[in-house]
Curated annotation (Swiss-Prot):
Keywords in alphabetical order: Bacterial flagellum, Periplasm, Signal
Coiled-coil regions listed in the entry: none
Gene this protein is translated from: flgI
Localization annotation: Periplasm; Bacterial flagellum basal body
One Pfam short name: FlgI
Name under which the protein is recorded: Flagellar P-ring protein
GO cellular component, one term: outer membrane-bounded periplasmic space
Secretion signal, residue range per the UniProt entry: 1-33
GO aspect biological process, one term: bacterial-type flagellum-dependent cell motility
Any one Gene Ontology molecular-function term assigned to this protein's record: structural molecule activity
Superkingdom, natural source: Bacteria
Amino acid sequence: MRPLVAARRRAAACCALAACMLALAFAPAAARAERLKDLAQIQGVRDNPLIGYGLVVGLDGTGDQTMQTPFTTQTLANMLANLGISINNGSANGGGSSAMTNMQLKNVAAVMVTATLPPFARPGEAIDVTVSSLGNAKSLRGGTLLLTPLKGADGQVYALAQGNMAVGGAGASANGSRVQVNQLAAGRIAGGAIVERSVPNAVAQMNGVLQLQLNDMDYGTAQRIVSAVNSSFGAGTATALDGRTIQLTAPADSAQQVAFMARLQNLEVSPERAAAKVILNARTGSIVMNQMVTLQNCAVAHGNLSVVVNTQPVVSQPGPFSNGQTVVAQQSQIQLKQDNGSLRMVTAGANLAEVVKALNSLGATPADLMSILQAMKAAGALRADLEII
C-alpha cells in the first residue's frame, strides 16, 4: 500500500504545481515601477520659449530676393543706421525712387530665431538656437547670424544670439535643374546665444510648499505617489489635491530643498494601468492602441467603394465645304464599383495580441479600419476610448 500512497502524493503535487503555473500564466502582469521624475514634474520648473528677428549674412547668392521681400531691405537699413551708416534716400538723378528700395542683395536673408531658456538658467550660460528663413531665401548654408536679441512672452530680452550656422541639408542647381537633400531653409547654432537675464525662481517663492503635477491624470497613480512619499519622508508630507496635482511640504532652506527634491525624484512608484485607448491619425491613416484594448464578439461587413472617372478628348471634324471649324471636346465616363462585403465574425480578444489578430482577419486597409473601429465603438464591441488626431 505504501507505493500506492506515494504515487498518489506525487500526482497531487504535480497537479498543484500545474495549477500554480496556470495561475501565474493567466495572472495580469504587475505594473513596472518607475521613477517619480518620469511620472510627474514640479510646478514652476519648466522651460521658457524665446523668439527674435534677425539677419543672416554671408550667403553665397542664395539669400532673399530683396525686391520681393521689402522687410529684409528695411531691416538691413535699420541695422546700418544703428552702426552709423546712412543710406541716401534719393537717387543720384534726384528722382523719387529710394536707394533702399533699389538695393538688390543676394547674400542676406531675414530669419526668425527661436530658443528655449532652461529652468534655473543664469546670465552667461550658452544655449542653442534655431534659425529659420522668413523670406524666399534658397539656402542658409554657410551664413552667419548677426547679433539678435531674444525676447520672452513678457517682451523682455533674455538672451543675445549670434554665430555661424550649421545647416544639415545640401543642394545644387544649374540650367533650371535642382537637386536638394534635406532642409536648407533652417539651421542651428550650438551654444549660439548667451543668457543675459534669469527667470525668477518660482520654487524659492513657494516657501516650502510645492506642487507635483502628474504627466497623465490618474487618481490611482496619485494615491500611490502620496503613499510612497509619506512612507519615505513621513506622514503628511504629500497630499493629493486631485487626480493630477499633489501638494508637498518641503524644507524651506534651499540646500535642504535640493536634497529633498533629489531624493523625491528617485522614488520608485508603480503607476496604475492606463485607460484603454485607440488613437486614429486621420491625416496619415495610422492606428495605435495600447495593451488595455479589448474586443467583444461582433460581426462586420465592409465593402470597398471605388469611383473611376476617365476623361478622353474627342475631335469633332466638320464636313467638307461646310465652313466649319475643328472642335476638341472632352468626353467623361464615370464608373462606380462596389465590392461585395459579406459578414465576418470577429472573435473576442482579451489582450492586445488577440485584438490585432482579430482585426487583421478582416483584411481591411488602415483607412477602412478607422471606419470599422468607430462602428465597433458605437456598437459596444470595442472596449476603448477613440481619439482622432
